[in-house]
C-alpha cells in the first residue's frame, strides 16, 4: 500500500447507499452503523476535509420496484426522494450527536424540515467546515441518487465522488459468483464502458466522465477504508480519464 503524508482530496462528495445503513437489519436503519459512519466522517472533518454527502433510499423504499408492480413511476420516485430525506435526517442527527456541525438540504421544498438546496449556500457551508447532506436526489423522477451524487459533486467542485459500497471496489465480475474475479485498482471511464462494468447507472457515470470528476469505489464496511481513500492510498478502485497500468 502506498502512503501519502497529506490528504489527496480537499473537498469530496461521499455517496452512501441506503442499504449500507441497514447493517444486518434487513430493513430501515441500524443505529450502530449510522454512528460508526458518523465517526468516520467526523475524522475527515477534523483533518480539514470538506464533506458533501448523498445517501440513497433503498433501505426504506424503492420506486422502480413498485413501478414494475403497476405504480406510476413518477409517484414511486417521489416517494423514493422522501426516503432519502428520512435517511438524511437520521445521518444529520448522528453527526450532531458526534458534535459535527451539519446542514441538511433538499432538492424539493420541505419547509420546517430542512432547507431547499442552494448551490452558493452549500459552498459557503462547506468552506466553513460544516458537513452538507444533499437529499431528495436531483428533485426529478427517473434520476438515481448516483446521478444526484455526481451532479452535486460537480456543482460543489468536489475533487472526487467517493462511492461507498459493500465490496472492496470494482471487479471484473461479480465476486459473489466468481471468487477469482479481478479487483481493479484503477480504470479509465472508457474501460468501464467497454467492459460493461457495473459502477453506477449510465446517466450518472457519463455525467462524471464528461465533467472529468474522478470516482473512487471502496468498501465502507472496512474499518479505516474511507480515511485510506482520502489519504490517496491504493484503496478500492479509482476511475478517471487515466488509462489503467497493465501489470
Curated annotation (Swiss-Prot):
UniProt KW keywords: Allosteric enzyme, ATP-binding, Cytoplasm, Kinase, Nucleotide-binding, Pyrimidine biosynthesis, Transferase
Pathway(s) where this gene product acts: Pyrimidine metabolism; CTP biosynthesis via de novo pathway; UDP from UMP (UMPK route): step 1/1
Positions annotated to bind UMP: 57, 77, 138-145
Compartments it resides in: Cytoplasm
One cellular-component annotation, GO: cytosol
Binding site for ATP: 15-18, 58, 62, 165, 171, 174
A GO term for molecular function: ATP binding
Activity regulation information from UniProt: Allosterically activated by GTP. Inhibited by UTP.
Reaction(s) catalysed (UniProt annotation): UMP + ATP = UDP + ADP
Pfam family, one: AA_kinase
EC number: 2.7.4.22
Record InterPro entries: AceGlu_kinase-like_sf, Asp/Glu/Uridylate_kinase, Uridylate_kinase, Uridylate_kinase_bac
Region (Involved in allosteric activation by GTP): 23-28
Record-level GO BP terms: 'de novo' CTP biosynthetic process; UDP biosynthetic process
Function recorded in the entry: Catalyzes the reversible phosphorylation of UMP to UDP.
PANTHER family: URIDYLATE KINASE, URIDYLATE KINASE PUMPKIN, CHLOROPLASTIC
Assembly with partners or alone: Homohexamer.
NCBIfam families: pyrH_bact (TIGR02075)
Family: Belongs to the UMP kinase family.
Name this protein carries in UniProt: Uridylate kinase
Organism: Colwellia psychrerythraea (strain 34H / ATCC BAA-681)
Gene that this sequence comes from: pyrH
